[in-house]
Amino acid sequence: MDPIDPELNEILDFTEYGPLTPIPQDDGENPLAKICYTTGYEQGMAYFRAIMAKKEYSLRALNLTGFLIMNNPAHYTVWAYRFQILNHTPSYIDNELEWLDEIAEDFQKNYQVWHHRQKILSLTKNYERELEFTKKMFEIDSKNYHVWSYRVWILQNFNDYSQELKLTNELLEKDIYNNSAWNHRFYVLFETSKVVSWSLEEELNYLKDKILFAPDNQSAWNYLCGVLDKSGPSKLDNLIANLRKNLPALHKPLLEFLAMYEPSSSEEIYQKLANEVDVPHAALWTWMSQRSNP
């Protein structure tokens, strides 16, 4: 048997916590495709099985799960047992989010990391800290699906939407093409009705400025389509008049939107897209034209 991994030996601290008989992985007599683990990880999992078997919730058990997570952050059984330890010994919870902060950058797109944060936050209730943490993560990757999902989960569970408009303003100021920020803005303003310090008129002015600044930004046009769906065409008349005045008549994103905004003219607009504006995709626009006037 290989000598025990030095880091693992220090974590297990047999002098302090007593002996522990490892339980090796049982792959059967003739495994078809045995996975080749590192020695430290294989030994760690053997001791982890032993700790689970005896239902040990000690500090060494917690540290062992940390060792295993650093070697395999997707091992949901280890994460689940780590939470059992924390739930059993609440005094360990105080440092858990700090530990998660340290590993977040390395494993920022790992599902288990974010699910574990949700479970810890359900115990600590300190959601303000986590909202600030997500902002720091956006500085690393402002389009990280996992971070956005976690932030939405926080909003839904703690019902504090007061920072969201400011957050999307800041992110779109840095990157007007940030589709994640546009999606989040639409969600909090038009899907939740939780943000009170805004008006549709102000939002349409904001949107007008963003579209005129970057007329080919599909994210902003998609946002406008959502506003049309939620508010109806009559609320957008002034905005559309302004866009028509300031954008070329054959501007492709404008024409695509006008086909939805003015259904009675959609057949003509799609024909214009097919024949003049976007000839390489003429087949699509011809089909859209036929579909608009069955």
Curated annotation (Swiss-Prot):
PANTHER family: PROTEIN FARNESYLTRANSFERASE ALPHA SUBUNIT/RAB GERANYLGERANYL TRANSFERASE ALPHA SUBUNIT, PROTEIN FARNESYLTRANSFERASE_GERANYLGERANYLTRANSFERASE TYPE-1 SUBUNIT ALPHA. It catalyses: L-cysteinyl-[protein] + (2E,6E)-farnesyl diphosphate = S-(2E,6E)-farnesyl-L-cysteinyl-[protein] + diphosphate; geranylgeranyl diphosphate + L-cysteinyl-[protein] = S-geranylgeranyl-L-cysteinyl-[protein] + diphosphate. Keywords: Magnesium, Prenyltransferase, Repeat, Transferase. Catalyzes the transfer of a farnesyl or geranyl-geranyl moiety from farnesyl or geranyl-geranyl diphosphate to a cysteine at the fourth position from the C-terminus of several proteins having the C-terminal sequence Cys-aliphatic-aliphatic-X. The alpha(cwp1) subunit is thought to participate in a stable complex with the substrate. The beta(cpp1 or cwg2) subunits bind the peptide substrate. It comes from Schizosaccharomyces pombe (strain 972 / ATCC 24843). GO terms for cellular component: CAAX-protein geranylgeranyltransferase complex; cytoplasm; nucleus; protein farnesyltransferase complex. The keyword Cytoplasm does not apply. Pfam families: PPTA. Belongs to the protein prenyltransferase subunit alpha family. InterPro entries: Prenyl_trans_a. The keyword Transferase applies. This is Protein farnesyltransferase/geranylgeranyltransferase type-1 subunit alpha. It comes from the Eukaryota. GO terms for molecular function: CAAX-protein geranylgeranyltransferase activity; protein farnesyltransferase activity; Rab geranylgeranyltransferase activity. It is an enzyme of class 2 (transferase).
